[in-house]
Amino acid sequence: MFSAAGAVARWIAPFLTVAAVAGMWFLADPVQVGPAPAVRLADDANPLAGMPFYVNPNSAAMRAAQHADPPSAELAAIANTPQAYWIVPGSSAGTVAKYTGDAQAAGAIPLLAIYGIPHRDCGSFAAGGLATADDYRGWIDGIASGVGATRTAIILEPDALAMADCLSADQRQERYDLIRYAVDTLTRNPATAVYVDGGHLRWHSAEDMAARLNKVDVARARGFSLNTANFFTTADEIGYGEAISGLTNGSHYVIDTSRNGVGPAPDSGLNWCNPGGRALGTPPTAATAGAHADAYLWIKRPGESDGTCDKGDPPAGTFVSQYAIDLAHAAG
């Protein structure tokens, strides 16, 4: 049976130190895998180790926890767990600079998820993105300027490579070019660890995804991210990640464990869209079981809707307190 007191002990305890530091309480045809560059530009030392991850004191989860009546141990635990700050069109260089600067002042690593590629989400529940390639390049320039020399982790364009098949040939090439541009621009700050999103193991074969990652010069980044906003188990994603790593000159990777505590929902058309019965996964940590896994992270923010899901759910990105509480309950 779920115990609210137990939930706090299990979920918030690992991050009291973070909060204190931050000054807060609160398969298809065979694929030809393109060659990866022989020399990695990123230092092999884990850039996510040795410092806590930043807790956003102004997140939707934090606001919900602060205003919960009666108080919710589950919401407090989730709010005080480090999660990604999503950068979408409209976010300014000043916004990025303030967020990363606040994290730096707190002695913590900020985690950003950049989500603004043209034709984003192929017109699905999180459709949007910048209108043109030039707009996107200028936006990336602004983000890089905002990050500056701050030690930062970046998840670059969730789903963009995995979803590229929905595009025309010209649009697909433009997408590869834009992600490559973002990798090159963001990694000019040697303290920025960039992870290009690589989908998950049920979407593309390791060979296919490695080929896509090599096309965007993943070897110039720290590596790639897996399972973003999805539910596949950490063990399964480690197997997938190690296979991709072997095809991308030893790239490192991170895994989104925010909602994978009991794995995915049974197969169905929209089993990824606000499925019931899912659970919080391992809290963020750089202590992993994968040889090339830098960290388990909460990239998706637990409690935020995946979209309307063709059933009248709240729009994508809307924080729903009961959904967050249900994820905590399912985690036990």
Language-model segment annotations:
Residues 1-17:
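N-terminal export and membrane-targeting signals
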Residues 56-79, 199-322:
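Surface-exposed substrate-engagement region within the catalytic domains
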